[in-house]
Amino acid sequence: METMSYENRIALGNLVPTLGQFKVMDKIPQYQQCEVHNLVEAPAEVPEVLRHVVFNIERGQTLHETIDFLNMCPELKNMDIIYANELDDGAVRSGNCNVAYEIAKSIGMNYAYGLEFIELVNPDDNKGFHGNALFSRWPIRWAKVVHMPEQYNWYYDRQKRIGARVAIVCSLDIGGREVGAVSVHLENRADSEGREAQMAVVYDEIRRSFAPDTPVMIGGDLNTNTFDGNDIPGFTALFNDPERLAKHMAAVEKYERVLPQAEENGFSYREFSSIEGTRRKPMPGGKSMLLKLDWLMARGMECVDHGTISTETKDCTWAEPGSALAKFTGPELSDHNACWADCRFAK
């Protein structure tokens, strides 16, 4: 995507208090774009089972180590599609590079990328872009960005931003068969009803874009906290009550409408996603709260197997000697674990 000067970014940001996020976004062409880059040839044959992976990259701040993780992890050797969240393009914190392109090039995949936020805090950011991506071994026929209803205005946050949450809706060509693939990132600073409203827009777009019998997989960080992310006293109290927290994590669907909503729209999630926690939310005192935020949900597919892969450095024992990952001394590559599901088309 074409860059914008920092001065232009700030000038547009200054319009948000008067115009609101969406009217400012309408003035920015990059928000209407979805980058699609088919970099590799399609595999010669379609396997019976395809591996789908959800991974919140956490901006790409450990880019080289993350690329090693994707290339070296035994459970990711034969992955077909990655539903990826939080990828920078031109931000100092991730090396001022295009994270999606660097990953796609290094792991041998095609990709689609859509802009979610323009960061306004750091004048040294080349672009300050931040968004979602979908990586695929299979050709991407087309892709579009879906802007979801605002549930939190990030302009007034310490992470001062222009933008709103997005989904990337893609049509893949898997051996001549159309398959829908949707990378989603829902709002954490919202309650269950807010996330449900965001997903309603995604389902509307799926109905417009695909025939009813087209297989579709949705994957991403749905931020199913089981609480309102703005309620700091509320989730702190939950953290301090391990028994109640365990009940929340064991029955996320009771607290998060997006899960029963999936079934109401013809998508299954129970057999495609592990019940293990996927995100380590930092808490006071150097502690963390383990939450189940990352999901795969599908229609027209059957799950053969699924699992979760730790992104904590201590668990990457398979890292090749001398690699960036093997040399990495940080505690984790991302604050999210990666999740996968092996799926075949329903008969």
Name each region found by the language model.
Residues 58, 88, 117-118, 185-187, ...:
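Catalytic metal-binding/acid-base residues of hydrolase active sites
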Residues 50-57, 70-96, 135, 170, ...:
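Active-site beta-strand/loop signature of hydrolases that rely on acidic residues for catalysis
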Residues 62, 66, 99, 103, ...:
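Stable alpha-helical elements in mature extracytoplasmic
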Residues 8, 43, 49-68, 88-92, ...:
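Acidic/histidine-rich helix-loop elements
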Residues 147-154, 187, 309-319:
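Short, solvent-exposed aromatic-acidic interface loops
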Residues 61-63, 90-93, 120-124, 128-131, ...:
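Short catalytic/ligand-binding loop motif for oxyanion handling, primarily in non-cytosolic enzymes
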Residues 2-44, 87-178:
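Structured beta-strand-rich core segments of catalytic domains in phosphoester-bond hydrolases
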Residues 1-38, 207-217, 224-347:
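Metal-dependent phosphoester-hydrolase catalytic domains
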